[in-house]
A protein has these predicted regions:
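Pan-zinc metallopeptidase signature
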Residues: 73-196
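Short helix/loop segments within enzyme catalytic domains
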Residues: 21, 33-35, 44-73, 98-116
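Zinc-dependent metallopeptidase catalytic helix centered on the HExxH motif
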Residues: 1-55
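Second-shell loop/turn segments in exported
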Residues: 25-31, 72-79
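Short consensus segments that form the blades of beta-propeller domains
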Residues: 31, 80, 241-245
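Loop/turn elements at helix/coil->beta-strand transitions in domains of secreted/extracellular proteins
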Residues: 48-52, 85-86, 231
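Acidic, Ser/Thr/Pro-rich low-complexity intrinsically disordered segments
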Residues: 106, 115-135, 189-265
Length: 265
């Protein structure tokens, strides 16, 4: 219940650009999905006061499962595309009363609420572990180095002494993970590709190596800066086939820093 309420809270009081869909700890996910699901898992443990996420189901709630929030699940993936990594990071930051861990940071649920409602919404980047951590850093600037160390412990931001909301310096390209058929994605990075208004077109590739709809590299992200108020035209065309279609029709969405969105389908 807390997990699902968390989705409601983030949608109504903060920002959440997750596309939803099926997910598990072994999935390499769209980073928006990884953040949304991992954060909601951690919230459940924080609110209830349990270092495990517990989900019940069936007649009389007689079945279900639980996931540890203080350690990595035995066959989960690690990285910015992992809901397990996100859950552990969020839980470690805000488990202020926990004596069960040795992490070096303990912020409060009030701090998390401030980060989500005041600092996350104005951030231009989409909702991922990177934009969330930037919002937390703005809430608690003195915790910056500890937040970075926590990211590094989950194979995130390994090659940098700083991090930003875009994941600009990310080097974890998910190449350590293969699909059921032995494939590896080559389209995980950069997380956000720079696009310059008026410049040459940018080639951006997608794939379904690790599954479809909400998995890593199914959708790609770009960023751009508009310097002047004017009318601008954006155009996307396919250069090949994919996802079982002989003639793909690319769709794209444009989001402004104020949260306004435009769809081209």
């Amino acid at each position: 219940v807390v997990h699902e309420w968390g989705h409601f809270f983030s949608d109504q009081m903060s920002r959440d650009f997750s596309v939803g869909g099926p997910h598990s700890l072994t999935d390499l996910l769209d980073p928006r999905v990884a953040f949304s699901e991992g954060w909601a898992n951690a919230l459940s443990g924080l609110v209830i006061g349990n270092d495990r996420y517990i989900d019940t189901s069936g007649q009389g709630q007689s079945s279900g499962f639980s996931i540890p929030l203080e350690r990595t699940y035995f066959d989960s993936v690690s990285g910015w595309y992992s809901e397990d990594s996100v859950a552990q990071i969020v839980f470690d930051i805000f488990d202020e009363t926990s004596a069960l861990d040795d992490d070096e940071i303990q912020l409060s649920l009030k701090d998390m609420t401030v980060a989500l409602t005041e600092h996350l919404p104005p951030i231009a980047a989409t909702t991922t572990i990177f934009s969330f951590m930037k919002a937390v850093e703005e809430t608690s600037p003195q915790s910056s180095s500890k937040l970075l160390n926590l990211l590094k412990s989950h194979e995130i931001a390994l090659a940098t002494d700083d991090f930003d909301e875009w994941g600009s310096s990310e080097t974890n390209d998910a190449s350590d993970y293969t699909s059921a058929t032995g494939g590896r994605t080559s389209n995980a990075l950069p997380i956000h590709t720079e696009m310059t208004v008026g410049a040459d077109p940018v080639l951006l590739c997608q794939d379904a190596v690790h599954g479809e709809y909400n998995k890593l590299a199914n959708r790609r992200f770009m960023k751009m800066t508009i310097e002047e108020t004017a009318s601008y035209r954006f155009y996307a065309e396919s250069t090949g086939t994919g996802f079982g279609r002989t003639s793909p029709d690319p769709d794209f969405y444009i989001w402004g820093t104020n949260g306004t969105g435009w769809a081209a389908e």
